[in-house]
Amino acid sequence: MKVVVQRVKRAAVTNKSIHNEIDKGFCLLVGIGKDTTEADIDAVAKKIINARLFEDENGKLNLNIQQVEGQILSISQFTLYADVRKGNRPGFSNSKNPEEANVLYEKFNTALKAYDVEVKTGEFGTDMEVEIINDGPVTIIYESQDGKII
């Protein structure tokens, strides 16, 4: 599992059927790989919720998303598993098949919500417009394999 976490002042996702937006918080680009398990979902969700990526009164990254009452915008992003080693067109054989990936993506969002953080989402498997106003910028990539952060 790969998740790109961007600290944002505002973020929005739109397609033909939905429009969701958040203010201060995280915009997550969530990739579900062919080897992603529920243990990875839990490990990454916990790590992101506890990540101290917001400044305290002294300007140090000391506060987590719960402490700043931030929100999360979670967007599925299978292209995080692109294989670009051969040719000029990326391959996506390292991504989990869409049906299984959607189940794990929903479980990931449920795991985040279990920490009493407001989570909004894009629509799995559709083309979307994503609008992000980064804060910092602070961008961190979290990866998990076999239930462990790598």
UniProtKB/Swiss-Prot annotation:
Its EC number is 3.1.1.96. GO terms for cellular component: cytoplasm. It is found in: Cytoplasm. It is an enzyme of class 3 (hydrolase). GO terms for molecular function: D-tyrosyl-tRNA(Tyr) deacylase activity; Gly-tRNA(Ala) deacylase activity; Ser(Gly)-tRNA(Ala) hydrolase activity; tRNA binding. The keyword tRNA-binding applies. It catalyses: glycyl-tRNA(Ala) + H2O = tRNA(Ala) + glycine + H(+); a D-aminoacyl-tRNA + H2O = a tRNA + a D-alpha-amino acid + H(+). An aminoacyl-tRNA editing enzyme that deacylates mischarged D-aminoacyl-tRNAs. Also deacylates mischarged glycyl-tRNA(Ala), protecting cells against glycine mischarging by AlaRS. Acts via tRNA-based rather than protein-based catalysis; rejects L-amino acids rather than detecting D-amino acids in the active site. By recycling D-aminoacyl-tRNA to D-amino acids and free tRNA molecules, this enzyme counteracts the toxicity associated with the formation of D-aminoacyl-tRNA entities in vivo and helps enforce protein L-homochirality. NCBIfam families: D-aminoacyl-tRNA deacylase. Homodimer. HAMAP family: Deacylase_Dtd (MF_00518). PANTHER family: D-AMINOACYL-TRNA DEACYLASE 1 (PTHR10472:SF5), D-TYROSYL-TRNA TYR DEACYLASE (PTHR10472). This is D-aminoacyl-tRNA deacylase. It comes from Staphylococcus haemolyticus (strain JCSC1435). The lineage of its organism: Bacteria, Bacillati, Bacillota, Bacilli, Bacillales.
